[in-house]
């Protein structure tokens, strides 16, 4: 992956493969949707705050996840995952990576880098999954970019579950990652 910058009749190419991880509060005070503290923001303050992330920018983010504040008592318990839980997660990830290596003939390609023209070849959807995606795309007004991101994330979810085909639960879970909390 590269990015080309054109300036003063010159073109410069730079590598551009990266992973963006970002965080933000749900509102200016940080407590919108909090179970323990009340938000002190007005609806218009929340809306204006959330509009700082434009639709086109959000459209380029594969997954959004709302993370609630962790209770202090739980933080103090500090219970790490046990070895069997860690092993199960690690095995699932390794298996998903193995599926991707097989799918792409051991290349460095991953599901997230699929082009829209490659979706039919590498990301088979069951008829039910396709119907769910089409209905969701209409009701959620998904852009073309978001539509294909849902499929690519669902392909990875299916890989984690050792499924050759993307089924309805994979699409449903992937769609949940396209949602962002708005007031």
Regions found by a protein language model. Give the residues of each.
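Basic, amphipathic alpha-helical bundle interface domains used for macromolecular binding and assembly
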Residues: 1-183
């Amino acid at each position: 992956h590269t990015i080309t910058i054109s300036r003063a009749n010159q073109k410069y190419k730079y590598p551009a493969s990266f992973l963006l991880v970002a965080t933000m509060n749900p509102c200016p005070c940080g407590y919108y949707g909090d179970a323990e503290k009340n938000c002190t923001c007005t609806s218009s303050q929340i809306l204006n705050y959330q509009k700082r992330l434009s639709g086109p920018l959000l459209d380029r983010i594969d997954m959004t996840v709302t993370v609630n504040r962790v209770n202090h008592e739980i933080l103090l318990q500090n219970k790490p995952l046990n070895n069997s839980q860690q092993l199960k997660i690690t095995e699932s990830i390794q298996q998903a990576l193995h599926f991707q290596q097989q799918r792409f003939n051991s290349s460095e390609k991953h599901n997230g880098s699929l082009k829209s023209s490659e979706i039919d070849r590498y990301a088979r959807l069951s008829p039910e999954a396709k119907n769910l995606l089409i209905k969701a795309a209409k009701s959620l007004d998904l852009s073309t970019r978001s539509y294909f991101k849902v499929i690519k994330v669902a392909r990875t979810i299916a890989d984690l579950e050792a499924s050759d085909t993307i089924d309805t639960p994979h699409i449903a879970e992937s769609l949940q990652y396209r949602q962002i909390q708005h007031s």
